[in-house]
Regions:
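ALDH superfamily catalytic-core signature
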Residues: 195, 230-374, 397, 437, ...
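Glycine-rich loop-to-alpha-helix module at the N-terminal edge of alpha/beta enzyme cores
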Residues: 32-121, 132
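Residue-level signal for inorganic ion chemistry
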Residues: 11, 31, 67, 89, ...
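A structural signal for short, well-ordered beta-strand elements
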Residues: 24, 38, 60-61, 93, ...
């Protein structure tokens, strides 16, 4: 019997009677159908907005320390259920257990950051800003917020959004990816268990119709999105046109730049983790490797080929020791294999073909290395979102930086070097938002904002960190005078 995943509207978990379309949820490691999710629409979004609006009236005036206390309880429940959550992520997403634990851990870090809301949302004051005038700024919640999240991080990305939004005094509607709804449901159940009042956090499942309804609904004031650049731009444009605050994180083509003086062993570990972790399905995956100089490139082609030949690609729901799991579904598998099959026609060389490492069932593509990729080809321009590392051979650091800066994306880039001068030039000249020096995945922790540039981000204020607090609050400035003997002076 199939498990149908319910919506959360107010305090009620329910599958809407009016919904007639459902899509299957697969275990990517086996292809097994493990449930189905309803494709909801405007009616369900309206119900969620109504519940969130009612809850906002009381939650927005709940003292910040009380909101923080609920988040502290939530954080404790997340820790108690850590292993269960990680295995749920592995089951519906396919990443290895260790990667799933990292997914959950990074989400919990955002909850921990949000627990400090009593400090984070403090305003500013300046007594006697003018004669007998005191000035105070306050940060206040903005209203009903919405989040639209992808399949690649079922725990972390939703928790980039709703804990901080709710900590700031807002209410929230989450539309998780229809491919991975199980983790989101469990996260919401634990928040209820922590004592969160009904209607503060709601979940509506669905596809394009729900996305557009959230972006256009007059009762929603802000929309957060993570996904492809094509849909990020759509969400940003549609939401902005309807008067909403929007932060929309899109795709990426992150570069791993290896200098001749890079330390071999730590650099190898960093490249493998960056390019092939989570089967390459993350917006901070290293997907372009630039070995500066032919000798450097030749050495790294050999090192990587030897390491990849020992990779264990397996069913992550059954083998906790697998190095890599599947991609999310059959469509993703077909698309990634298409990039590999088309490589020779663009003049590139398949240096290591991971397709032969793939298990017979499930949606697998083994770790693959493609050398001599040229600018202007699809391997350079497009986000593959799979375990394929494209290798390029710039002659100098200057040439590498120039090549990187032609790209339309601007999420992350890393340099591996022992030279402080090279690292400094790299950090000064690269045009993207998150940089690593001898770090393979330069994704910031919750204390800092996730700062994509160019077509990797649409909006002004990023997720996480203080920018996240600013996104989910608005500023009020109060000028007050309480003097006994007021004499009008200079317009005051």
């Amino acid at each position: 019997m199939k498990t149908t995943i319910p919506n959360l509207i107010g305090a009620r978990w329910e599958t809407p009677a009016s919904v007639t379309q459902f899509v299957p949820i697969h275990n990517p490691s086996t292809g097994e159908v493990i449930g189905e999710v309803p494709l909801c629409g405007q009616v369900e979004v309206d119900a969620a907005v109504n519940a969130a609006t009612r809850a906002f009236a009381t939650w927005s005036v709940t003292p910040a320390p009380k909101r923080a206390a609920c988040l502290f309880r939530y954080r404790e429940l997340l820790e108690q259920n850590f292993e269960q959550l990680a295995r749920l992520v592995t089951r519906e997403n396919g990443k290895t257990l260790e990667e799933a634990k990292g997914d959950v851990r990074r989400g919990i870090e955002v909850v921990e950051f949000a627990c400090g809301i009593s400090h984070l949302a403090k305003g500013e004051s300046l007594p006697q800003v003018a004669d007998q005038i005191d000035a105070v700024t306050m940060r206040e919640p903005i209203g009903v917020c919405a989040g639209i999240t992808p399949y690649n991080f079922p725990a972390m990305v939703p928790m980039w959004m709703y804990p901080l939004a709710i900590a700031c005094g807002n209410t929230f509607i989450l539309k998780p990816s229809e491919k991975v709804p199980l983790t989101a449901v469990r996260l919401a159940e634990l928040f209820q268990e922590a004592g969160l009042p009904e209607g503060v956090f709601n979940i509506v499942h669905g596809g394009r119709e729900v996305v557009d309804a959230l972006c256009t609904h007059p009762g929603i004031v802000a929309v957060s999105f993570v996904g492809s650049s094509r849909i990020a731009e759509h969400v940003y444009t549609l939401g902005s046109r309807h008067g909403k605050r929007v932060q929309a994180a899109g795709g990426a083509k992150n570069v791993l730049l290896v200098m001749p003086d890079a330390e071999p062993d730590p650099t190898l570990r960093a490249i493998l983790g960056s390019a092939y972790g989570c089967a390459g399905q993350r917006c901070m995956a290293g997907s372009l490797l630039m070995g500066v100089g032919d000798q450097t490139a030749d050495e790294w082609r050999e090192r990587l080929g030897a390491a990849l030949s020992e990779f264990k690609v397996d069913d992550t729901s059954a083998n906790d020791r697998a190095d890599m799991g599947p991609v999310i579904d059959g469509a993703a598998q077909k698309r990634v294999i298409g990039f590999v099959e088309g490589a020779p026609a663009s003049g590139a060389e398949i240096a290591f073909d991971g397709r032969r490492l793939s298990p017979d069932r499930g949606f697998f593509v083994g770790p693959t290395l493609i050398d001599r990729v040229q600018p202007g080809t699809n391997l350079f321009e497009e986000e593959i979102f799979g375990p394929v590392l494209s290798m390029m051979r710039p002659k100098t650091l200057d040439e590498a930086i120039a090549m990187m800066n032609t790209h339309s994306y601007g999420n992350g880039a890393s340099i591996f070097t022992s030279s402080g001068a090279a690292a400094r030039q790299f950090t000064r000249e690269i045009q993207c938002g998150m940089l690593g020096i001898n770090v393979g995945v330069p994704a910031p922790m919750a204390l800092f904002s996730f700062s994509g540039w160019n077509r990797s981000f649409f909006g002004d204020l990023h997720v996480q960190g203080l920018e996240g607090v600013m996104f989910y609050t608005r500023q009020k400035v109060v000028l007050s005078r309480w003097d006994k003997n007021y004499v009008r002076s200079q317009g005051w």
